[in-house]
Design a protein with these regions (language model features):
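An acidic, phosphate/nucleotide-engaging active-site surface
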Residues: 107-157
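Beta-strand-turn-beta hairpins that frame and shape the catalytic cleft
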Residues: 4-15, 131-144, 199-202
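Core catalytic region of metal-dependent phosphoesterases/phosphodiesterases
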Residues: 2-17, 22-127
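Short C-terminal domain-edge/linker segments immediately following a structured domain
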Residues: 44-50, 77-81, 126-131, 172-181, ...
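Conserved beta-sheet core of the metallophosphoesterase superfamily
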Residues: 140-144, 149-241, 245
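Short, flexible loop/turn elements at secondary-structure junctions
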Residues: 18-24, 136, 147-150, 208
């Protein structure tokens, strides 16, 4: 398990991207470009929770593209190049990057694509699960980034799957991708220190995607009737006293 850290004496803004699925015929490229530009203009930092690429090409069993969209399918190498081109304006501002299950499938054929992308963007690479240990204006904010795994169809099932991570890994913020949803919630633990009771608040954020599931005539996600979540990312604003998050659509 990998760890990376970052320290600042100023308020910190982070755009949390996930599941961009670059190369998919239903990839919401225009919206991603808008958010990348917003991140650049604000001088903000960013993370990526994996599934950078679609990576589903005609030789993959999941390839289900309507005939009139087949000419839009990029090769895997072209998808990598396009991802690097899109995120070039944010090079050097990434705090952490993961691989998702789509990159892991590609790894069997062409190696660790997620690591390759992260290195080209001068961003720490954490695999599929890792810690980003922040210190913002004196406040310690450990973040657990996990790409995610199948957690069931309903929101409660996904929340339970995410919450289990808190029994294994202590953090203030749990960022999870894979589900293409936006269902943030909070809880807290109480502990004793110097005979006083303190509260440790925790934030659980399932990240949205840039995969517009029902935008075209057919794809693998449609065939499984997957949840159609919001298109966008999370924006974290961190100070010495507060943790705020918002959905960017």
């Amino acid at each position: 398990m990998r760890i990376t850290d970052f320290k600042t004496d100023e308020p910190l803004t982070i755009y949390n991207f996930s599941d961009t699925h670059i190369g998919a015929v239903c990839f919401a490229e225009k919206k991603l470009k808008e958010h990348i530009e917003m991140c650049r203009e604000e001088g903000a930092y960013w993370t990526h929770n994996g599934d950078w690429l679609e990576g589903i090409t005609p030789d993959d069993r999941r390839y289900m593209v309507p005939d009139d969209d087949k000419d839009k399918t990029l090769s895997t190498l072209a998808q990598i190049d396009h991802a690097l081109e899109l995120f070039e304006p944010l090079k050097g501002k990434g705090l952490a990057s993961l691989s998702g299950n789509h990159e892991m499938v590609l790894a069997r054929k062409i190696g660790d694509v997620g690591k390759r992308i992260a290195r080209r963007l001068d961003t720490p690479y954490l695999g599929e699960l890792g810690y980003l240990n922040l210190k913002v204006m004196g406040q310690n904010i450990p973040i657990l980034l996990w790409h995610g795994a199948w957690g069931g169809e309903l929101r409660g099932a996904k929340a339970n799957r995410q919450h289990r991570q808190s029994h294994k890994f202590r953090a203030k913020i749990y960022l999870t991708g894979h589900w293409h949803t936006w269902d943030p919630y909070q809880d807290s633990q109480h502990y004793i220190k110097r005979n006083k009771i303190y509260k440790y608040k925790r934030y659980y954020i399932s990240l949205p995607s840039y995969y517009d599931t029902y935008a075209n005539g057919g794809n693998y996600a449609q065939s499984r009737a997957y949840y159609d979540g919001p298109i966008g990312c999370c924006k974290l604003t961190l100070t010495d006293k507060s943790i705020k998050y918002e959905l960017m659509e």
